[in-house]
From Swiss-Prot:
Species annotation: Sulfurovum sp. (strain NBC37-1)
Name of the featured protein: Ribonuclease H
GO molecular-function terms, A-Z: magnesium ion binding; nucleic acid binding; RNA-DNA hybrid ribonuclease activity
Function of the molecule: Endonuclease that specifically degrades the RNA of RNA-DNA hybrids.
EC identifiers of the protein: 3.1.26.4
Keywords per UniProt: Cytoplasm, Endonuclease, Hydrolase, Magnesium, Metal-binding, Nuclease
Protein family according to the UniProt entry: Belongs to the RNase H family.
Main location: cytoplasm
Length: 147
């Protein structure tokens, strides 16, 4: 019996916080074979790093089956954690790690998938990153206006 190949998904994500901490938003795009799904959300009191990470978590939660996922982000915090730091954080039981609640949520959301992070320079003309930034900023502004 031949094992079926996993779908290759690209997850673009960005986060924004007005005040850091302050109202914040995240925006993301899931891409598969040319199809795109945008998503966004936010919180009343948060930081940019929390929103960067929430954007990835929420995107992973939208996937309905195990996939190979490339996370594309302008957050070196998120990309380096995914690719380099997370295993040692787990071994050290997250001692001295910020946003432990979200990293544990990330681990749960990422568990069925193979996830790798790719860093892109922010505000550098990368269309998907620019769109995610727009979604995140719009959500942060919407939340700020509602307070």
């Amino acid at each position: 019996m031949q094992k079926q190949a996993r779908k290759q998904i690209t997850l673009y994500s960005d986060g924004s916080s007005l005040g850091n901490p302050g109202p914040g938003g995240y925006g993301g795009i899931l891409e598969y074979k040319g199809s795109r799904k945008e998503y966004f959300g936010g919180e009343e009191e948060t930081t940019n790093n929390r929103m960067e990470l929430r954007g990835v978590i929420e995107g992973l939660k939208l996937l309905k089956e195990p996939c190979d996922v490339e996370v594309v982000s302008d957050s070196s915090y998120v990309v380096k954690a995914i690719n380099e730091w997370l295993e040692s954080w787990i071994r050290r039981d997250f001692k001295k790690v910020k946003n432990v609640d979200l990293w544990k949520a990330y681990i749960e959301a990422a568990a069925p998938h193979h996830v790798h992070g790719t860093w892109v320079r922010g505000h550098d003309g990368h269309p998907e990153n620019e769109r995610c930034d727009e979604l995140a900023r719009n959500e942060a502004e919407r939340i700020k206006a509602s307070l």
